[in-house]
Swiss-Prot record:
Signal peptide: none annotated. SUPFAM superfamilies: Thioesterase/thiol ester dehydrase-isomerase. It comes from the Bacteria. This is UPF0336 protein TWT_721.
Length: 140
């Protein structure tokens, strides 16, 4: 398997940001209203801090179809960390880059550590770095 995989960029829309904010039941108006966000000094509607998780589905689909030989029914989510360089805003065009940081066996299981970096399509700057730890259980 390639250790670094680039995915197509995705445009972040106000609609998706507001939909996600409603789904996680946040009350902060900067996640629901462009006017509230701009009056708070932001350039536009702000993404809820966990919004980066919307890219995880695409990453998991790739991992399952890769040569890592993973059965989706055996994956357990270990942990996930978000390191923001700046907030995600409506209008951003973000390109995810996946790196497999670790793939090690222990007992009848594996630990796979993924790093997903969201790059700004315009500046190529890091916006968010997510570290995702998956545990792949062995067959019973």
């Amino acid at each position: 398997m390639t250790q670094k995989v680039e995915f197509p960029p995705r445009h972040v829309t106000e609609e998706k940001l507001m939909e996600f904010a409603r789904a996680v039941h946040t009350q902060n108006k900067i996640y629901h209203s462009t006017a509230a966000a701009t009056s708070s000094g932001y350039p536009g509607l702000v993404a809820v801090p966990t919004f980066g998780a919307v890219w995880v589905g695409q990453i998991l689909e790739y991992i399952i179809s890769s040569d890592l030989n993973i059965d989706y029914s055996h994956i357990v989510h270990g942990e996930q960390h978000f390191l923001y360089k700046r907030p995600i805003f409506a209008g951003d065009i973000l390109r995810p880059i996946l790196r497999i940081k670790r793939d090690r066996a222990f007992g009848n299981a594996r630990q796979i550590v993924l790093e997903v970096t969201l790059l700004s399509e315009g500046s190529n700057d890091d916006v968010l770095v997510m570290t995702i730890t998956l545990i792949v259980r062995g067959k019973a």
